[in-house]
């Protein structure tokens, strides 16, 4: 283990020792989540009593569109939330004083957990076929929107010629 990693690990371990004592003063915490599997741990933790054992009353709150999370935190409708990295970075770049508590996932160039689905009969079979089409994403500027634009660019398609609209997952079939 490198020295920097060791120091970081020790600091993180030391910081976690104080969490139970500090958590007892937090009371109710409303946590915003979107309809993705990453938030399963939130529900498991609540069901298993992880939060209540530490003096926290955690209330999960469904947020249909990921880019709404920073604004909801700013307005104190949520105390915590899970925006995608691109949404978080845009919020902080825009002047919101938010911090990251912890990460929930990791994506690499070889990740295959995300895909693009087109309705039968849409005529969409390649990236080029998306030009002039209306594509629904669960948040403009969010992870799937940014990733889709990157995929189009890699395929040589000008993503500005694709009409992206913001739609929550249940609406994508429409």
Could you describe each region identified by the protein language model?
Residues 5-23:
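N-terminal export signals
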Residues 24-168:
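Short, glycine-/small- and polar/acidic-enriched structural segments
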Residues 168-174:
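Short, intrinsically disordered, charge-balanced linker/junction segments flanking boundaries
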């Amino acid at each position: 283990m490198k020295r920097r990693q060791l120091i970081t690990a020790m600091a993180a371990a030391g910081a976690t020792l104080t969490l139970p004592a500090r958590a007892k003063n937090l009371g109710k915490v409303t946590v915003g989540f979107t309809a993705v599997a990453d938030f399963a741990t939130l529900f498991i933790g609540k069901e298993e009593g992880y939060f209540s054992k530490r003096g926290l009353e955690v209330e999960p709150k469904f947020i249909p569109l990921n880019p709404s999370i920073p604004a909801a935190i700013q307005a104190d409708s949520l105390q915590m939330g899970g925006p995608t990295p691109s949404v978080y970075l845009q919020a902080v770049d825009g002047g919101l004083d938010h911090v990251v508590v912890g990460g929930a996932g990791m994506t690499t160039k070889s990740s295959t957990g995300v895909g693009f689905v087109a309705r039968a009969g849409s005529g969409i079979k390649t990236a080029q076929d998306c030009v002039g089409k209306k594509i629904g994403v669960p948040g403009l500027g969010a992870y799937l929107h940014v990733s889709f634009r990157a995929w189009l660019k890699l395929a040589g398609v000008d993503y500005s010629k694709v009409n992206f609209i913001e739609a929550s997952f249940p609406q994508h079939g429409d």
